[in-house]
Amino acid sequence: MENLLEMQKNVKAITRKYEEDLIKLNVEVWKDIDGYDNYAVSTFGKVKNTKTGRILKAGNDKYGYLQINLYYDGVMKTHKIHRLVCCTFIDNPDNKECVDHKNNDRTNNDISNLRFATANENQQNRKLSNNNTSKVKGVSFNKKAKKWHAHIQIDGININIGYYDNLEDAKTARVNRANEAFGEYTNACEKL
């Protein structure tokens, strides 16, 4: 019995390594969705009915995320596809609660574009608002001082980085501070 358990562990480890190698080669890998007998999700962000082999058509929620309806015992439940992909294929040892789209494209649910994040990390990697004229989060022109103001929020605390005569210096200061604070979760448009 002990040998059988050891063999099962070895098979699982080999299977996991094989799946990881396929993912690195950008090969589509399918896995069953936990809690559902008839559905599988792929590393490319597709969902299929395993009984019929049919790829299911996803819809958008009001925020632009792709979602899918799955049925179990006649009961329908709606799931966000990015969560299905991430929870199925990516380990989450730190138990981070959010799934982040690295490139901010809510419809790109490829495994290479997803990662687990805390709520704070997820907030750092968001698109700029449309009224941002500096094109960098946390940099604005202060009319009274007639200078560019760089600031940042870390753990809910607003921090003044400084006032600068030109936009480029303010951007550089903000980007450097964001990289220090948030690392890989710094928004792509904030990188120098």
Task: State the predicted function of each range.
Residues 12-99, 103-192:
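Conserved recognition-core residues within compact binding domains
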